[in-house]
């Protein structure tokens, strides 16, 4: 077996055999546009010792005319070598390999390095730049160093800094679609976007004007949502580029996609940021009916705490009405039973918020007749139960500025009703406030002493005075007095 056959076919290279063959055969002998030297550099078991043997026998470190590519580009592109490729590349450079020589296939050593995510570290890039490599080269795809690096799997801010500091441009567009570096990074790294890199690219002049940029940001956000990727800092960055209620060509908003893909974390984030759940897409859907269609109980409950428009209620109830109608026709009995709690929450909220009649949804009323009647009775009773011109309904559902302790007695009557969860929440807050109020009243009395003006005031007046303070004011005043 000759040197070419040994290097190309042997499962494991033995250095003693390789040394013997190199004494006989030319390491730069061209065969099918390849030399034994370049073939050796493509192997997974290429070592510095083996490379030293080739160099000792006179192998050309810049390759021979007619070969596929240069030895340095071969090593830098060989991902099978892992971190070993860095040591081999440095060995070639120390032996005289040209770091700026374009290989016969049009590639440059720096671009080969930046494509290889095993070795494209800031340290090695700095080494190449110190050895005189040019950062103004372009590959066969037209990309410069920054675009090439952005498309690799290992994008680190320190490496980008080294390239930009050496003069590499961040303004290279994508040759196929016209995306800039920032957009390419967002598209290529949906799961691993780093907000520091995004800010770095934006700070160095990447075009962020609307139009294509807004479309790319929105589409990237949709991909993140569909993959379940949540990064609050990256989302904050995206929403500096587009609106929280941005709509794509189909009139979908980001929160629409959260509901469609059941992405709870981004859904909660968008609601916190003030996303409008009532926006209607071109299919005529808003978030509430999409959540009902998906059977997502969590999202339905979260949405019902927001202000829902009558039309949004109508669409959601039409979904429920249709599902109940389909029980006998399509065997959906188990489906409706499984989502009964969700449907009841929707009905309960609709009866509370809307002046429209639930009876128009015939199948809903037939199926949930007792529950619907109970909701209506309790709603009407709460509206009729009035204390000091304020109804229990207004007190329980935040239609007055703040419930008072005097409302506890009449609120307690509705603890076991269909709106009991809301009433319990109000009562808990009132009891907590009463505890804070009582503590502050007693603390002021202790501070003033038995002969003070505060102590001589009637008890109900003392409590009325403190009751006008907000929770934060009560807390701050107590802390100051206690200190």
From Swiss-Prot:
| PROSITE patterns recorded | ANK_REP_REGION
Recorded hits in Pfam families, A to Z, give:
Ank, PRANC
Q: Which UniProt keywords apply?
A: ANK repeat, G0/G1 host cell cycle checkpoint dysregulation by virus, Host-virus interaction, Modulation of host cell cycle by virus, Modulation of host E3 ubiquitin ligases by virus, Modulation of host ubiquitin pathway by virus, Repeat, Ubl conjugation pathway
Per the entry, what this protein does is: Substrate-specific adapter of SKP1-containing E3 ubiquitin-protein ligases which mediate the ubiquitination and subsequent proteasomal degradation of host target proteins including CDKN1B. Disappearance of host CDKN1B correlates with cell cycle progression through the G0/G1 checkpoint. Therefore, viruses in infected cells are protected from diverse innate host antiviral responses normally triggered by G0/G1 cell cycle arrest.
Ranges for the ANK repeats: 32-63, 67-101, 105-137, 177-210, 250-279, 283-312
Which intervals of the chain are annotated as region PRANC/F-box-like? 390-478
Signal sequence interval, chain numbering: none
Q: Which GO terms describe its biological process?
A: symbiont-mediated perturbation of host cell cycle G0/G1 transition checkpoint; symbiont-mediated perturbation of host cell cycle progression; symbiont-mediated perturbation of host ubiquitin-like protein modification; symbiont-mediated suppression of host apoptosis
What InterPro entries has UniProt attached to this entry? Ankyrin_rpt, Ankyrin_rpt-contain_sf, PRANC_domain
Keyword Repeat present in the record's keywords: the answer is yes
Is Endoplasmic reticulum found in the keyword set?
no
Quaternary form? Interacts (via PRANC/F-box-like domain) with the SKP1 component of the host SCF ubiquitin ligase complex. Interacts (via N-terminus) with host AKT1.
The protein's superkingdom reads Viruses
Say which species the protein is native to: Myxoma virus (strain Lausanne) (MYXV)
What name does this protein carry?
Ankyrin repeat domain-containing protein M-T5
